[in-house]
Amino acid sequence: MESNKDEAERCISIALKAIQSNQPDRALRFLEKAQRLYPTPRVHALIESLNQKPQPAGDQPQPTEATHTTHRKAAGANTASANGEAGGESTKGYTAEQVAAVKRVKQCKDYYEILGVSRGASDEDLKKAYRKLALKFHPDKNHAPGATEAFKAIGTAYAVLSNPEKRKQYDQFGDDKGQAARHGHGHGDFHRGFEADISPEDLFNMFFGGGFPSSNVHVYSNGRMRYTYHQRQDRRENQGDGGLGVFVQLMPILILILVSALSQLMVSSPPYSLSLRPSVGHVHKRVTDHLNVVYYVADTFSQEYTGSSLKMVERNVEDDYIANLRNNCWKEKQQKEGLLYRARYFGDADMYNKAQKDGAPQAVTDCQRL
């Protein structure tokens, strides 16, 4: 089973670390568990290597070297069999199953197919599918070519489908946008036509409490993930043959900038803040009549807003306050749920107890305020 294979890989990883730390008994225990879960010649060779050359805890040079040699051979064989053309792309090993899984995601036509769920899937179904795939495709665990892009596609798929409004829009227009994006960018872009507001790496950290370092993923200030090779490719494609060509290509961007600037001038900033903001003059504290929400205004607020206009402002204040509570409550619940899942996945009782305590008081408080 796929779950047994993932657990076996985790046991192998722990065993290799134990060998490096001169803990042969611990290494042997986890290797035997891995062999029971998902028997492979590689694990059998590691077990034989430890059994043939037992050493005291403080003197383990020969088993360690033999085991590392066996591991390197197994990793090299997996890499060569997985993809001969991509062998030089990464110095880390990967399996044929990982390459096939990346290929499956790459060939998916919509977000539902990426997550492996039906169009009528519930929120719980989406969470289960995302947890399984995110751990499987995270760039620090899966080193197959294209795994990083597949991880991004999985995160974007969940972020869109878990948002009721975005999911409704995607069900109506997502396929058309996905086709336009694929025609414009090729298969390597993994459905860039319909973006989410949260980056896949941030989403992973919310679910699993930052279980992996983001060494291969670049997240910029707008919260969406981009990759350097896409930028270099776009720059090469957008280079014009002359000044007129450059001007024609830049014309849509200039128009967009002009429209954005005009819209900023036409839209005034809110006359209130939910927190103290001296930089914009919101220093005077007020409380709404209905929900007693605290907000801050400028010196001239009392003269400019009275009667119905004041009621409208306070209604907007309360709407913003409730939206913030819902967002914070959802994030804290997701983070706690992710920590609990990781604790159960790794069988760590201390982590489970910590997850039961961390974040719970604030999450309950925010939800109760609603």
Swiss-Prot record:
Modified-residue entries (Pros-methylhistidine), positions: 185
Pfam families: DnaJ (PF00226), DUF1977 (PF09320)
Complexes and interactors: Homodimer and homotetramer. Interacts (via J domain) with HSPA8/Hsc70. Forms a multiprotein complex, at least composed of DNAJB12, DNAJB14, HSPA8/Hsc70 and SGTA; interaction with DNAJB14 and HSPA8/Hsc70 is direct.
Protein localization: Endoplasmic reticulum membrane; Nucleus membrane
Family designation: Belongs to the DnaJ family. DNAJB12/DNAJB14 subfamily.
Cellular component GO terms held in the UniProt record: endoplasmic reticulum; endoplasmic reticulum membrane; nuclear membrane
Alphabetical list of Gene3D superfamilies matching this protein: DnaJ domain
Annotated stretches, region: Disordered: 51-92
Membrane topology summary: Single-pass membrane protein
UniProt keyword annotations, A-Z: Acetylation, Chaperone, Endoplasmic reticulum, Membrane, Methylation, Nucleus, Transmembrane, Transmembrane helix
Domain of life: Eukaryota
Transmembrane segments: 242-262
Reported function: Acts as a co-chaperone with HSPA8/Hsc70; required to promote protein folding and trafficking, prevent aggregation of client proteins, and promote unfolded proteins to endoplasmic reticulum-associated degradation (ERAD) pathway. Acts by determining HSPA8/Hsc70's ATPase and polypeptide-binding activities. Can also act independently of HSPA8/Hsc70: together with DNAJB14, acts as a chaperone that promotes maturation of potassium channels KCND2 and KCNH2 by stabilizing nascent channel subunits and assembling them into tetramers.
UniProt entry tagged with the keyword Ribonucleoprotein: no
Record PTM text: Methylated at His-185 by METTL9.
All residue ranges annotated as the J domain in the record: 110-174
Name of the protein in its database record: DnaJ homolog subfamily B member 12
